[in-house]
From Swiss-Prot:
Family, per entry: Belongs to the RRF family.
Protein name per its UniProtKB record: Ribosome-recycling factor
Localization in the cell: Cytoplasm
Gene from which this protein is expressed: frr
InterPro entries with a match to the protein in the record: Ribosome_recyc_fac (IPR002661), Ribosome_recyc_fac_dom (IPR023584), RRF_sf (IPR036191)
Bias type Basic and acidic residues, positions: 134-169, 176-186
Length: 186
């Protein structure tokens, strides 16, 4: 592998790790309604598990309410069952056409749990990024042994991989801090 290939692969994988974290963080409840809380809930319908966002439009008509409008009215019971099973602490109100979810404000204890969950997710993302760094460094060493790059190129590649790692970890920290701030605000 060339230096450019190693760097491109590492950057791509690190960006993916950051985007997975951001996706996971969007599913963490804050004090206000957010479609991200429910859009990835899997609903068993038509014999398979389907993400809710493919079965219904999801909106927030009020700051404390999520409104779910199924595209097919026959799926409303399945959607309601999946929300209850999703263990979000939200009680769906089904009027036959739409499902309303009232998002209660978070208590202090729940906020602390959410913040600790955010920190866990951020740490998992950092571990993933460090593993990607290790793989990239190993690829650079292998390329040097196979005479595909010089020792100087290997060292330069390792330095660039470290820069990518710092950038990705900064993105992880910023995403986690922003979500923590959202959880802690009233």
């Amino acid at each position: 592998m060339t230096s450019d290939e190693i760097l491109m692969d590492a950057e791509e994988r690190m960006d993916k790790a950051v985007s997975v974290l951001q996706n996971n963080l969007s599913g963490i409840r804050t004090g206000r309604a957010n479609p991200g809380l429910v859009d990835s809930i899997k609903v068993e319908v038509y014999g398979s598990l389907t993400p809710l966002k493919q079965l219904a439009s999801i909106g927030t008509p009020e700051p404390q309410q999520i409104l779910i409008r199924p595209y097919d009215a026959t799926t409303i019971k399945d959607i309601e069952k999946a929300i209850v099973a999703g263990d979000l602490g939200l009680n769906p109100q089904n009027d036959g056409r739409v499902i309303r979810l009232n998002v209660p404000p978070l208590s202090g204890e729940v906020r602390k749990k959410m913040v600790s969950r955010i920190k866990e997710l951020a740490e998992e993302a950092k571990v993933s990024i460090r593993n990607i760094r290790r793989d990239a460094n190993k690829a650079a060493e292998t390329a040097e042994k196979d005479k595909e790059m010089t020792e100087d190129d290997r060292d330069k590649t390792k330095d660039q991989v470290q820069e990518l790692t710092k950038k990705a970890e900064t993105n992880v920290n910023e995403s986690a801090k922003a979500r923590e701030a959202e959880v802690m605000e009233d």
